[in-house]
């Protein structure tokens, strides 16, 4: 197998974003907030900052190291986009007979789903991360934040909390479903 001598990716840093690199720890500050991430579990990858660019590189890379360079570069790009614009997931509450009520408990960091399929007990979904904000507007649930992984996992937790088991999904279509996601406008 051929090992390439030098693999690297460059990430441009926008003007209103500051990036601090300490070894393999990256902290990104921007208008929406700051995100810190530790990549110290990754071996043989070098992170450095030159002028207004971040360089992720490795030497004598095999297939796995080459993939890691791209993965870490993508994580850092997502951090930069998050502190600049933020991320938003939109979910739709769908029911046919029993009206579903959704309440957000910010103190306990949970979303409480009541009266799903007429059930007496509430279904609970965890809100991941301190920076994630969940709001309910009529039939829509909006999950917003600066960390794409926390926002996406929170939306997935809400969707999975209303999963229907042992019934035909074509007939029992009740639930909460993700219908739109991406960067905030």
Curated annotation (Swiss-Prot):
Molecular function GO labels: rRNA binding; structural constituent of ribosome
A Pfam family that the UniProt record links to this protein: Ribosomal_L6
Keywords: Ribonucleoprotein, Ribosomal protein, RNA-binding, rRNA-binding
Keyword Transit peptide (UniProt): no
Gene3D superfamilies noted in UniProt: Ribosomal protein L6, alpha-beta domain (3.90.930.12)
Entries under InterPro entries matching the protein: Ribosomal_uL6-like, Ribosomal_uL6-like_a/b-dom_sf, Ribosomal_uL6_a/b-dom, Ribosomal_uL6_arc
Superkingdom per UniProt: Archaea
This protein's record includes keyword Nucleotide-binding: no
Any one cellular-component term (Gene Ontology): cytosolic large ribosomal subunit
Assembly and interaction partners: Part of the 50S ribosomal subunit.
The name this protein goes by in its record: Large ribosomal subunit protein uL6
Organism (species): Staphylothermus marinus (strain ATCC 43588 / DSM 3639 / JCM 9404 / F1)
Gene: rpl6
């Amino acid at each position: 197998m051929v090992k390439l001598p030098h693999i690297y990716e460059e990430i441009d840093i926008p003007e209103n974003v500051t990036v601090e690199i300490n070894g393999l720890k990256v902290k990104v500050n921007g208008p929406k907030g700051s995100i810190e991430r530790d990549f110290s579990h990754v071996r043989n990858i070098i992170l450095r900052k030159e002028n207004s660019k971040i360089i992720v590189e490795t030497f004598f890379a095999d297939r796995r190291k080459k993939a890691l360079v791209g993965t870490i570069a993508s994580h850092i790009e997502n951090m930069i986009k998050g502190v600049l614009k933020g991320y938003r997931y939109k979910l739709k509450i769908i029911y046919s007979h029993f009206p579903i009520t959704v309440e957000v408990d910010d103190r306990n960091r949970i979303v409480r789903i009541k009266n799903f399929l007429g059930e007496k007990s509430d279904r609970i979904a965890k809100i991941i991360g301190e920076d994630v904000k969940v709001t309910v507007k009529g039939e829509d649930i909006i999950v917003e934040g600066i960390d794409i992984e926390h926002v996406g996992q929170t939306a997935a937790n809400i969707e999975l909390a209303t999963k229907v088991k042992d019934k035909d999904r074509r007939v029992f279509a009740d639930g909460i479903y993700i219908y739109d996601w991406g960067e905030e406008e």
